[in-house]
């Protein structure tokens, strides 16, 4: 029912930092925000994307929850000339495991969207929709057709899986699937 991005404070953090540092240097990123997507599969780690920007799709918000570092605040202060080394110190993480879960749905006219029931669950920090009631959701061909998202944290992977399922089912969504004539 969607894509997910999980962040855990796992032992391979140091190795990931070394990989990302090596990838940023050849593209000229030395200061400012930098974004990297990695695919970690067992002992294999590959770089998918490197960019001179903060990540989208709630990446910075998720990172703040599981690492304590507020990249949005730091980048805003840097852009305004007010960033100091103290601003680069991470705060206290909310939880060791988190996820951005994107919500997808079949195409059709959106009748009802309500995220409040999911937001009432402990560990759900944000829940929202990219589309509005009355709009027609097109078939899923890219990330632009995602219906919405959930931003969640938990104390472990199993708890996060359960919370994610519960939050997805708590979303009040009604879509009138339209048939082509």
Briefly describe each language-model feature range:
Residues 43-46:
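Conserved protein kinase catalytic/activation segment
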């Amino acid at each position: 029912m969607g894509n997910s991005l999980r962040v855990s404070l796992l032992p391979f953090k140091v190795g990931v930092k070394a990989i990302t540092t090596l990838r940023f240097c050849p593209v000229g990123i030395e200061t400012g925000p930098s974004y990297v997507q990695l695919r970690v599969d067992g002992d294999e780690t590959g770089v998918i994307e490197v960019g001179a920007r903060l990540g989208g799709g709630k990446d910075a918000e998720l990172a703040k929850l599981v690492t304590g570092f507020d990249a949005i605040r730091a980048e805003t202060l840097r852009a305004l000339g007010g960033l100091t080394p103290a601003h680069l110190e991470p705060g206290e993480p909310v939880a060791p495991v988190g996820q951005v879960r994107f919500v997808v749905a079949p195409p059709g006219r959106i009748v009802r969207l309500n995220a409040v029931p999911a937001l009432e669950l402990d560990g759900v920090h944000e829940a929202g929709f990219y589309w509005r009631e009355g709009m027609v959701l097109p078939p899923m061909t890219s990330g632009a057709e995602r219906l919405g998202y959930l931003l969640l944290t938990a104390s472990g992977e199993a708890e996060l899986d359960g919370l994610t399922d519960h939050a997805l089912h708590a979303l009040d969504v009604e879509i009138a699937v339209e048939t082509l004539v």
